[in-house]
Amino acid sequence: MGRCCFYTAGTLSLLLLVTSVTLLVARVFQKAVDQSIEKKIVLRNGTEAFDSWEKPPLPVYTQFYFFNVTNPEEILRGETPRVEEVGPYTYRELRNKANIQFGDNGTTISAVSNKAYVFERDQSVGDPKIDLIRTLNIPVLTVIEWSQVHFLREIIEAMLKAYQQKLFVTHTVDELLWGYKDEILSLIHVFRPDISPYFGLFYEKNGTNDGDYVFLTGEDSYLNFTKIVEWNGKTSLDWWITDKCNMINGTDGDSFHPLITKDEVLYVFPSDFCRSVYITFSDYESVQGLPAFRYKVPAEILANTSDNAGFCIPEGNCLGSGVLNVSICKNGAPIIMSFPHFYQADERFVSAIEGMHPNQEDHETFVDINPLTGIILKAAKRFQINIYVKKLDDFVETGDIRTMVFPVMYLNESVHIDKETASRLKSMINTTLIITNIPYIIMALGVFFGLVFTWLACKGQGSMDEGTADERAPLIRT
C-alpha cells in the first residue's frame, strides 16, 4: 500500500508540473480569455460594448473656469495683466450617438456624437446667468484679425471707431459660454451673411454634435475598435502644413481597444483641439479596486520641436512650447490653445500674466484605462482657451498692450466610474483571473504531490534504516 502511494504521488506530481508548464508556455487559458474578450468588445447590435458606446453609462462633468481681468486700464498702458480664477461652473454632459448606420459588412459604422450640457448648481461657485466676468472683447479682436487680410478692412476700422468698441468687456458666464448677440458681428453679418451675429466660446455646441464620424467596429481586429476612419467626410485634415500633422489618428477618446499593453502609444482625435494627439503610459493605478494603466498627454505634444513644425501657422511662425495656434480652424479668431495655467508651456507665457499657477495635479490631462477591457475608469481632459493680442497702431482699441498670449478660460472634462459599474466589472475581471490562473493552480497541486512524494520517500528510507528486532540481532551469538 505504501509503495503504491509512493509511486502515485510521484507520477501525479510529474504529470501536473509538466501540464502546468505546458499550459503556461502555450498560454492556452490566456488565449481563450483574450479571444472571448475580442469577440465581446465589438460594435455590433446586441453587444454590451455597442450599448455603452451608443449611450455612455458613466456621468461626465465639465467644469468651466474663467480668468477675470482686474486691471484693464493698466493693461492698455502696457503693464502686466492681473487675472483672478473664477469657477468652477459645473455642467453634466448628456452624451449619445445618433444617426447610426452600419456599413462594409459590419466593419464600419457611421454616427454623430450628440452632446448637451445641464448646469449643476450644487457643484458650482455661483449662477452663470448672474455672475459677471471681465475679459477680452474676442469679437473685436477677431474682426481686427480679419481686417489684416480681408477686403472689409476699411469698413471694420470705421465700425470700430463709430461704435467706440473697447478691448475689454463684461458679460455673464452664460453669455460667454453659450453666446450673445454682438454689435460688431451683427453689422458685419449684413455684408457677410455666413458670419453669425452671435458669439460664445461654446456657441452652438450645446445640444449639438461636432460632425459626422465613420468608425471601425473592431469586427476585423480588436485593435481597430472605435478607430476613426472619417470625420465630416474627410480621411484627413487640411488645416496644417504636413500630411503627418493632418492625419486623423485613433479614437474620439470615449473608448479604447481591449488588451492594452503599457508599451502602446494610444492616439486620440479631439475635434475641439483641431488635431490628433497621443497619450503614453505613465504609471499603474487602482480605481475603485480595479487595476488601471494611467496614460498622460506628454509635454512633447505641444513642444516647440521639428516634429511639431507642421502645426506652426503660417509656416515657420512657431509661438513656443506649450501653445497651439488654432485660428485656422476657428474661423480666423486669434485663438491659442494650451493646457490650464500654461502647464508644460515656456515660462515666459506664465510670467507674462499675474495669476498663473500651473501644477500637475490640477492641470494635466490623463486617462486611467483598465488594460484587459479597454474601459475608461477615470479621466480628466483639460485645456485652456487663450487669445493672441498685440498692439496695432491702426486700431486705438489695442492701446499700448503688450504682445502676449492672454488666458480667457479653461475647462476640466472628467469622468469617474461609479461603485455599481465597478462592482460588475470587478466580478468579470475576477472570473478571467481565475481562468488564467488555472495553470498555476495545477502547478500548486503538482508541488503538493511532489512534497507528498518526498515525504513518503523519506519515510520509506527511515523504515529501511530501522528494520525489525530480528534484523538488528547479531548473526553469531555466544
UniProtKB/Swiss-Prot annotation:
For molecular function, the Gene Ontology terms on record are: cargo receptor activity; cholesterol binding; enzyme binding; phosphatidylcholine binding; phosphatidylserine binding; protein homodimerization activity; protein-folding chaperone binding; scavenger receptor activity
Q: What is the effect of changing residue 476 to D/E/G?
A: Prevents the targeting of the protein to lysosomes
Give the matching Pfam families. Answer: CD36
Keyword Disulfide bond part of the UniProt annotation? yes
Q: Where is this region: Important for interaction with GBA1?
A: 155-191
**Alphabetized UniProt keyword annotations:** Disease variant, Disulfide bond, Epilepsy, Glycoprotein, Host cell receptor for virus entry, Host-virus interaction, Lysosome, Membrane, Neurodegeneration, Receptor, Transmembrane, Transmembrane helix
Kindly give the membrane topology term recorded for this protein: Multi-pass membrane protein
Q: Where in the cell is it found?
A: Lysosome membrane
Q: What is this protein called?
A: Lysosome membrane protein 2
Q: Tell me the organism.
A: Homo sapiens
Which gene specifies this protein's sequence?
A: SCARB2
